[in-house]
Regions:
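Amidase signature
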Residues: 39-247, 251, 278, 282, ...
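A short, well-structured catalytic beta-strand-centered motif of the EAL phosphodiesterase domain
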Residues: 271-276
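Short glycine/serine-rich loop segments
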Residues: 1-43, 252-263, 267-270
Length: 299
């Protein structure tokens, strides 16, 4: 589960881009995720990302009843050119149909700007990560909160002695981010942050009509890790190809949950449930009901 931005404090964790970074629980079952979130959520008084967060008793939402819940299938989350696999799309659509059998109201809701989310994310993450990691030594400046000095020291040592161990993707991000800052002086970062407000508004408008958005978590099944001697272009492509549906909600801060919904060719397929800001209880409720309805490993 990626909770609403700021619901879980980020204190002490390694940051990448403060407006995108989230921490959340991972577990085998929805019940365990809900229980973990009850422990993790809430203000700690040290993380400036947290603003009027609203933690709840998430385990109480796991009633198994989703009668009348409005589920919206987002077509823009399917059929990504050159990325989406037909078996993944089909399995997620069938899984979404199962919600109807459980009493929910399932419909299609188009959000054209969803396709722009990855481009907005790229502009923010590339320049933001460069400023925070390269020039800010992983913690940055100009914010009030708890600075983890041990992390600063450790990262500084790594820069001095092991910078070449950074992944090909990270090296590209830092080089491109430095170029964008030097050449355009933050203009495209600023434009992307402004567009993030429009993207959030587009999803919020959809949430006037539905309670939960549905799409594949990844457009494809798990791919092979590139060989150690693979061209850097292949390494970077493998690293970034999986982000298309997930990263827009880093940008907007909406909660998003991966729900296993079946197996194809021996590999798991994930369905992503997205909720309103601080709507974790709703997507956990939907996930729990779905999870209880069948054995996804035999689907």
């Amino acid at each position: 589960l990626k909770p609403t931005h700021g619901l879980v404090p980020y204190t002490g964790a390694f940051p990448i881009e403060s407006t995108l970074d989230h921490l959340g629980p991972m577990a085998r079952t929805t019940a365990d995720i809900a229980l973990l979130l009850e422990v993790l959520a809430g203000e700690d008084g040290m993380d400036p990302r947290q603003y009027r967060v609203r933690p709840e008793a998430y385990t109480k939402a796991l009633t198994g009843n989703i009668e009348g819940l409005r589920i919206g299938i987002v077509p823009e989350g399917f059929e990504w050119p050159g990325l989406s696999q037909a078996d993944v799309d089909d399995m997620v659509l069938r899984a979404a149909g199962r919600f109807e059998q459980l009493g929910a109201v399932v419909s299609t809701i188009s959000i054209p700007m969803h396709r722009d989310g990855i481009h907005i994310w790229n502009a923010i993450s590339i320049e933001g990560a460069t400023a925070l990691m390269l020039k800010g030594n992983a913690m940055g400046t100009n914010w009030k909160g708890y600075y983890t000095t041990s992390l600063l020291d450790s990262f500084a040592r790594g820069w001095r002695t092991r910078a070449n161990d950074l992944s090909e993707t990270t090296k590209l991000v830092l080089l491109l981010g430095e170029y964008m800052q030097t050449r355009y002086h933050g203009r495209f970062y600023a434009k992307a942050q402004n567009l993030s407000l429009k993207l959030k508004a587009a999803y919020d408008a959809a949430f006037q009509q539905v309670d939960v958005l549905v799409m594949p978590t990844l457009p494809m099944k798990a791919t092979r890790i590139p060989a150690p001697d693979a061209p850097r272009e292949d390494c970077i492509a493998r690293a970034l190809e999986m982000l298309t549906n997930a990263c827009p909600f880093d940008v907007t801060g909406h909660p998003a949950l991966n729900v296993p919904c079946g197996m194809s060719q021996g590999l798991p397929v994930g369905m992503m449930l997205v909720g309103k800001s601080f709507g974790e209880s709703t997507i956990l409720r939907a996930s729990h009901a779905f999870e209880q309805s069948f054995d996804w490993q035999k689907a």
